[in-house]
Amino acid sequence: MHDIDFIKNNPELFDEAMQNRNFGKIAHKIIELSANKKHTLTQLYSLQKERNNITQEIEKLKKDNIQCDTQIELSKEITKKINHINNMIKTDSELIDLLNILPNIPDKKVPIGKDENDNIEIRRYGKKVDFKFPPKTHYELGENLNLMDFKQAAKLSGSRFVILKSQLAQLDRALANFMLDVHTQEFGYSEISHPVLVHESAMYGVGQLPKFADDSFKTTDNFRLIPTSEVALTNLVSNTNTNANELPIRLTACSQCFRSEAGSAGKDVRGMMRQHQFNKVELVSIVTEEQSELELERMTQVAEEILKKLELPYRVMMLCTGDLGFSASITYDIEVWIPSQNQYREISSCSNCKAFQARRMNAKYHTISNGNKVNKFVHTLNGSALAIGRTIIAILENYQNQDGSITIPHVLRKYMNNQDIIKNNNY
């Protein structure tokens, strides 16, 4: 949600920001709708004050046994006008509807561009494996080892699902435990276990609704399955006012995530790259305005640390204005090397949403200045660290051997009964 006062004071700057995010000029419309709403509310407050005065007059006249029919009729007329204006306010949602679909303002650092082709590479890490044989895809490796089953998953649930067996199921669990251990023990995040079904208000709070309603699954009783733990973790501070001394708050969780993948027809049809259901470890930070810039750098480095420990080659990209997520002001994507595709693919996205989500959630913090309490909206950040399915893909492809077996990364072996090789499963 945007600050209307900022739009009023900076209409040209706001229009430029929206144009860079592929929206037209809209500031004038917002200012006009806001002025109309303010005028309507002024009328309402004036009528309410007038009715209160008449009510007091009626009570006084009755007490003195003086006739007050005229005042009673006038009170009724004013009440009708108040009810009419209240109904207008309830039904006139044009301003809110407009603000709800406008994305966040890009940070000044964000490069201007149309799509992913205009993203900027920030840094690279790791050396790509020089295979002495043609590398197989993750799904060829998984199916050949009898550890990855898409056919049985399709019988159960349809396309874009997978069944992992034996050592790959262990790898999935090992990765979650490994990532959470790093985040909590080395970087001070607090682990949270949370519901995967949430109210639509929680989805609205982080910007998933109303614009992206088709991208998530909805139950018959109006719950939503979360597309990411960001929804649950960020909403833990909705409608709160935190003491600034308690910030930053750093949270992490591993959860199942659910996405309809609307608009993804034909993309990554084979394999685990794009699934309706997957596991992901998420990071969320709740910080002050002054802390948020450095917090994004820290969060990105935390996500990178997982890939460094797994010894997987990757690069960090800064997204351009045309590729930014709806709620993000600035985003770093971390892309891991996928040998079979001969390209880097996204495995993490770390974003600073500044106060955009906080306004939707009414999440504030307070400081004391000159003896007075000062309230501000918190800044929220989120990052994948990491998407577990895509990490499995990267491990299978980068650690594959010529015989089709997979070497288990050293840091994961203690989570997998000290095994060092993933090999054919007899089940």
UniProtKB/Swiss-Prot annotation:
A GO BP entry:
seryl-tRNA aminoacylation
What enzyme class is recorded for this protein?
ligase
State the signal peptide span.
none
Provide the residue positions that the database annotates as binding L-serine. T228, S229, E230, E282, S384
Show the Pfam families listed in the entry: Seryl_tRNA_N, tRNA-synt_2b
Name the pathway.
Aminoacyl-tRNA biosynthesis; selenocysteinyl-tRNA(Sec) biosynthesis; L-seryl-tRNA(Sec) from L-serine and tRNA(Sec): step 1/1
Q: Which family does it belong to?
A: Belongs to the class-II aminoacyl-tRNA synthetase family. Type-1 seryl-tRNA synthetase subfamily.
- Assembly behavior: Homodimer. The tRNA molecule binds across the dimer.
User: What is this protein called in UniProt?
Assistant: Serine--tRNA ligase
